[in-house]
Amino acid sequence: MEELQGYLEKDRSWQQHFLYPLLFKEYIYIFAHDRGLNGSIFYESAEIFGYGSKYSSLLVKRSIIRMYQQNYLIYSVNDSNQNRFVGHNNFFYFHFFYSQMILEGFAVIVEIPFLLRLVSFLEEKKIPKSQNLNLRSIHSIFPFFEDKLSHLNYVSDILIPYPIHLKILVQILQFWIQDVPSLHLLRFFLHEYHNWNSLITPNNSIFLFSKENKRLFRFPYNFYVSECEFVLVFLRKQSSYLRLTSSGAFLERTHFYGKIEHLIVVVVRRNYFQKTLCFFKDPFMHYIRYQGKAILVSKGTHLLMKKWKCHLVNFWQYYFNSWSQPYRIHINQLSNCSFYFLGYLSSVLINLSAVRNQMLENSFLIDTVFKKFDTRVPVIPLIGSLSKAKFCTVSGHPISKPIWTDLSDCDIIDRFGRICRNLSHYHSGSSKKQSLYRIKYILRFSCAKTLARKHKSMVRAFLQRLGSGLLEEFFMEEEQVVSLIFPKLTSFSLHESHIERIWYLDIIRINDLVNYS
């Protein structure tokens, strides 16, 4: 980020807050590649044309030279659409590759104002960079749950509505990006996206292009979600005597992430022409969101949560001109329900404990209530995800993976083992890890059936010939991983590893098999 700031300080066009001229700057594409922001297109796509990786910068320069030509973008897209059935026409590949390269650079450009806002926010709050990296872990939210949710009463499970038209997204961006050519170019890309998306064919090279251009088209939706959260800060500013403890918005690679603590509940009356605002101060309210799902928890009453629900529905309707169904917001009492978030089924358990109290010659038994935040793995939905991925049937019976039979034995075992270890790593915070045994069983026998199908033998005969230990080393248990990380913790027994929850700070995205909501 410091390198990009150094380039922008020297660039006169950026000093006048113009984004469009940055599209012709070579350092934008170099920055996109060096930072790992979908940079694979600069190497993998170059190999399709027969170039090595050392020619990637040459392709960038050629693309910039062609963009100086009048109406190049329009001709490039039209040529791509007209030649979609030509086959392996190099003319088609070159034009399509240049278009995708422009997309990669433009995706970085439109994020620059918000990245700089993030840097200024971190400098203002004096947040060290190392702590900023920890904020990227989605598992860091669960320790926050453990500290706060046991003292709260109600939870609102919210599904943020999707905007009905992309034009609304561009209109929202106009408040933050005043560069008109950049907005027109963004509108052009969004309009032509459906044509490019229709180019998905079994050909791996074409699928690569379609897979790599999602970053730009996620950006308007992520900004729309951020605007939905911005109303909380906006309404707080309308009430000068009510103080918001802390608020912040963090721009990550693919998702906006915001966590606001101690919100001030502000509900606008139905008569929007009145200037009277009805304030409900609730210092014990917390808001958490990931992607399009949000959780709003409060210590207040059920009436307060219903007012929040009414407020959110009206806000989406009048501000974004989109109808939001009230059933997308569920209000439940924490002690009587479980809510799904980030692949975990979370709830607040109530434990009763009898405490003996001795007072002089009399003794009393006092019943004490303890609330504990609990997280478990929803096994049935996870089996459904494995079924969609063709690892098992709907009922959970393991099946072979025919598409992987062309791979070597080591590659097959490595793929299954990596999936199993990633699931165990992601669900390390579950209080009952025994529920993952069924998932590991499905993956192990699916791997064995795939290998047996490749060698045209029965599963039992294949395992007897090579031994069941063939698969064990590729499915390392979580307690063995913990023992490698913390070798001095000799008291960490096998039984305790299935009870204690472990949250890792290296998980920056939800697991693909877990993202089934």
UniProtKB/Swiss-Prot annotation:
Specify one Pfam family: Intron_maturas2
Q: Tell me which UniProt keywords the record has, alphabetically.
A: Chloroplast, mRNA processing, Plastid, RNA-binding, tRNA processing
**Can you tell which superkingdom this protein's organism belongs to?**
Eukaryota
* KW RNA-binding (keyword) present: yes
One biological process term in Gene Ontology: mRNA processing
Concerning InterPro entries, the annotation shows: Domain_X (IPR024937), Maturase_MatK (IPR002866), Maturase_MatK_N (IPR024942)
- Which one of the record's GO molecular function terms can you name? RNA binding
The protein's predominant localisation is plastid
What Gene Ontology cellular component terms go with this record? chloroplast
| Intracellular or extracellular location(s) | Plastid, Chloroplast
Entries under HAMAP family matching the protein: MatK
Q: Which family does it belong to?
A: Belongs to the intron maturase 2 family. MatK subfamily.
The UniProt function text for this chain reads: Usually encoded in the trnK tRNA gene intron. Probably assists in splicing its own and other chloroplast group II introns.
Q: What is this protein called?
A: Maturase K
